[in-house]
UniProtKB/Swiss-Prot annotation:
Record protein name field: Nicotinate phosphoribosyltransferase
Entries under PANTHER family matching the protein: NICOTINATE PHOSPHORIBOSYLTRANSFERASE
GO terms assigned for molecular function: nicotinate phosphoribosyltransferase activity
Organism: Enterobacter sp. (strain 638)
Gene3D superfamilies, A to Z: nicotinate phosphoribosyltransferase
Record field: catalytic activity: nicotinate + 5-phospho-alpha-D-ribose 1-diphosphate + ATP + H2O = nicotinate beta-D-ribonucleotide + ADP + phosphate + diphosphate
EC assignment: 6.3.4.21
Claim: Nucleotide-binding is one of the keywords in the record: no
One Pfam family recorded for the sequence: NAPRTase_N
Keyword Ligase: yes
CDD domains referenced in this protein's UniProt entry, alphabetically: PncB_like
Length: 400
């Protein structure tokens, strides 16, 4: 390996919590389901030149395995069953599931294989891409620059919150996927642990080593896959919500609302789901409008919003989180997940706007429509039309 290509990843647990939570549900319910996922760069970065370095990292990932102390720690958490953890012990990344090409400067990546295995690629692979790119672009930058920026922002935040009751403010690190580096994320989390309102991280490795609560439930792919798993497209979102409760009847009960749109989600989120799920997560669209809709929905169902949690995780920074806290904190419980603005907030460093999203399940198309234009992902325009029709949405947005 070149000096720039020392391994980015050192443990299987250097991933987001929702990946393991979803993987266990897939292991128990959808063991044989096949999927395909694709990489997207939402910015104008030409990342194809890094294809060989990324390939090198992907090939090295086959050597990652769950260690005994990690297995013991996971066994002590309330989420996991023994059969899944025993299987996870034997899990190895299969680099043959990953196709990486440089298409005239554009980076193309496609993942394909059993869902129970492919599900594990997204977060560490995005972290690899982000770190490799930053190693080449900003080799002189690192932990001290990230911490200096954070200290400055925490100072401003302390001034902004002097006269605010912060007792109900909860903030989590959601920064694994687009971090500057593993070391930067670790340093940021360590510093944030000094703040009374910092409650956890989405990163399982950091949660274990820093004695933090691992945070995360499910992602868009859980709902997307059900578009083909469920026999009826119109009820696929309800099927996804029900299957999640089968796996986790009394915990991990935060539901992601924007795979189709918030309005379509709320039509499916009836009294039983609303009672049983602990809350909802916002990931696209106007956050204030979304929060007001959520609170109104709970009230309409006769549920006190103060018994529920709204999690905001879309493009947040500290000041945006504070704005939302001031707006909503008297009416509902709140948590804020901040990613890129914590773990890749360094002067002169441009964070990457990169994602990996499901595009097929069992050989058929799936889609994410979302509440933000430009976040729609699907190759098959006819399927997008069918999805919009099934969920009673106007035929306006084009698939990208």
């Amino acid at each position: 390996m070149t000096q720039f290509a020392s391994p980015v990843l050192h443990t299987l647990l250097d991933t987001d919590a929702y990946k393991l939570h979803m993987q266990q549900a897939v292991f128990h319910h959808y063991y044989d389901v096949q999927v395909a996922a694709e990489f997207r760069c939402r910015g104008d970065d030409l990342l194809g030149i890094y294809a060989d370095s990324i390939r090198e990292q992907v090939d090295a990932m086959q050597h990652l395995a769950l260690q005994d102390d990690e297995y013991q720690w996971l066994s002590g958490l309330p989420f996991f069953k023994a059969d899944y953890l025993d299987w996870l012990r034997d899990f190895r990344f299969n680099p043959e599931q990953v196709t990486i090409t440089n298409d005239n400067g554009k980076l193309n990546i496609r993942l394909a294989g059993p869902w129970r295995e492919v599900i594990m690629w997204e977060v560490p692979l995005l972290a690899v891409i982000s770190e490799i790119v930053h190693r080449y672009r900003s080799p002189e930058m690192g932990v001290e620059h990230a911490l200096a920026t954070l200290e400055s922002k925490l100072g401003e935040f302390a001034q902004m919150t002097e006269s605010v009751d912060m007792s109900r403010f909860r903030l989590m690190d959601f920064g694994t996927r687009r971090r500057f580096s593993r070391e930067v994320q670790q340093a940021i989390v360590k510093r944030l642990q000094q703040e009374p309102w910092f409650v956890g991280t989405s990163n399982y490795d950091l949660a274990r080593r820093r004695n933090l609560t691992p945070m995360g439930t499910q992602a868009h792919e859980w709902f997307q896959a059900h578009q083909q798993i469920s026999p009826d497209l119109a009820t696929s979102q309800r099927a996804a919500l029900a299957a999640w409760l089968e796996e986790y009847p009394d915990q991990l009960g935060i539901a992601l609302t924007d795979c189709i749109t918030m309005d379509a989600f709320l039509r499916d989120f009836g009294p039983e789901f609303a009672q049983r799920y602990q809350g909802l997560r916002h990931d696209s669209g106007d956050p204030v409008e979304w929060g007001e809709k959520a609170i109104a929905h709970y009230k309409k169902l006769g549920i006190d919003p103060l018994t529920k949690v709204l999690v905001f995780s879309d493009n947040l920074d500290l000041s945006k989180a504070l704005e939302l806290y001031r707006h909503f904190s008297a009416r509902v419980n709140l948590s804020f997940g901040i990613g890129t603005r914590l773990t890749c907030d360094i002067p002169q460093v441009k964070p990457l706007n990169i994602v990996i999203k499901l595009v097929e399940c069992n050989g058929k198309p799936v889609a994410k429509l979302s509440d933000s234009p430009g976040k729609t992902i699907c190759h098959d325009k006819a399927f997008v039309r069918a999805l919009r029709k099934a969920f009673d949405l106007p035929q306006i947005k084009k698939a990208s």
